Amino acid sequence: MKDEVIQIRNLSKCYGKLVAVKGIDLTIAPGEIFGLIGADGAGKTTTFHILAGVMEATSGEVRVLDKKPRDARLYTGYLTQKFSLYLDLSIDENLRYTAGLRQISEKLYQERRAKYLKLMDLDRFSDRLAGRLSGGMKQKLALWCALISRPKILLLDEPTTGVDPVSRREFWDVLAAIAAEGVTIVVATPYLDEAERCNRIALMHEGEIQQVGTLAQLRDSLGLQRLEVRTKDLETAEKTLVETRHVASGQQRNERSSQQATKTDITDIIDVQTFGDRLDILVKHADRAEAEVRKIFARQKLDLKDIQVTAPTLENVFVTRLRELGDEPESIPFPRLKSGGAEGRRGGGAEGLRSRGENTDNQLSIANYQDIAIAANSLRKDFGNFQAVKNVDLEIRYGEIYGLLGANGAGKTTTIKILCGLLEPTAGSISLAGETNNLRSGELRRRIGYMSQKFTLYDDLSILQNLEFYCGVYGVPARSRRQKIDWVLATCGLVGKENMLTGQLPGGWKQRVAFGAAVMHEPEILFLDEPTSGVDPLARRQFWRLINDFARSGTAILVTTHYLEEAEQCNRMGFMVAGEMVTQGSPSEIKAMQPGQLIEMAIDRTQDASNLLKTELASWRVSIFGDRLHIVLDNPESEIPQVRSILENSNIQVHSWRSIPFSLEDSFIGIVQRTSENGK
């Protein structure tokens, strides 16, 4: 078609014998936000390199603006995974340097500088060094540098990895505004919740395009629905339902089976996964599956609080399709040699809690209620006149997964470093594994695992050398080291590659090895600081399966993440804003706390509607999701007519609207913004 600005026909790219891209076909229209998703090594970055004109294809045809990609480079902005900012230059100096490279006139530079600095809310910080910016601000500056030449096409390779949810939403609002000006945007992202904002999405796997469509088309093609099941007996319920699914698979392959399960138990269950205080079950027919689940729970005498039917997410689509292609990571049991963190502790279990008058009727299974592993009281940390952590109170039990969430600079990493003894607090008290005094002792550190934001691996050592080093640091017995190392290699899919230099691994693979290094010694307490940043959805699911396994064996786990869909897997969580803990609770409790309703509107001229409503409402209350508008209203009965009137007075037609549940990201942004508005 003439209107298509990107045309790809039978594109292939080989690196020696490795075929990275295998005969793909794609067309992308002007002004479209097009998402490219896939596991690590799927071929996304190679495709971006070819589109940007920095790499030649092995075969096939690629046209960008009806030119060869190399000839279209003046009209293409490209933001790589590791965007190239000069950290010792200010925002203004970075912008001026980039404008000089692109030969932008002074007049055009000043016009574009004023426009985009205001759009990205960076005008107040123009003299700040790039090295002193938060992750979200660096990402906005890098985007500005890519926009300086007013490109017609913008290529963004995982631009929001490691960026907090508030900044990510602001970033996507900027992208929507740019697309409304006619710029075509192609974006690769490991965050499938944000990929749902794209007009169309392509799923790439092992160099091939498996599926292309809108979010609605991809969901419909799946032909499945999702049940959210809440129960106190999470572990037993998940195990029972997973076994039921496996029996179903066996019966489909073999007409007769010796397993004790009836046909009605197995027809509809496709996938089962724990998400914090609930189970997510992917099913063929919601009504029939709900009846089956209730029957299984009744037969096993399991607690059942609630079942809700919801639409599948893009992650459900992604994981199901890759599972059909046989690419699900193998689950290998951890070679555990000692009891879990809480086993045998005096006062643990339900009876110990009841004797102390504590509540046992909530989302954690009774078996996981044990003594407190981590406790902080009035914790404070000052750096000169700056208070990074302000009077934080925290309790985490053995067997619990606790999520510590907050925007960049909220104080999460500082809090973790204090709790695990790497930083001295300015004030407050800490208890770690029962120790209150010497938190730096070698004996205590061998009972703790820590995976930092910056990989704790040595790039110039091989994978095997790194793992052997950490076995020594953590005192893993010599007799079991080989077994533990073999487990890490097998879990990471690196058997036979253990002599590769760690620096040669992609970021997602490094994360897996770093996690393995942090748990080989079977810690009682595990600190994970953004462990899945940049990791693809399949690997992320494997991470959380392992995290849940360690928690169920008694390990206390504190995890930070910017990906709030995965934060739903935590039993409890706390939100930090500007160094303060502003709320704590289970994912369900926090979502239930939100005032008002989240309204989804199908309307004409989505960008114009967003711009208009942001002048009437606080800007954080309005966000574009694909071709829909999401609006947070505190009093929907009175505000919806007002919103419709505002839009219709500007000749913007509202086709339909409905109330939808708050996601954890919606809740997080609402809490952060309301706290800021209240001046806390």
List the predicted regions and their residue ranges:
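Conserved ABC transporter NBD signature motif
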Residues: 60-72, 428-436, 443-444
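Conserved ABC ATPase "signature" region
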Residues: 96, 100, 107-125, 468, ...
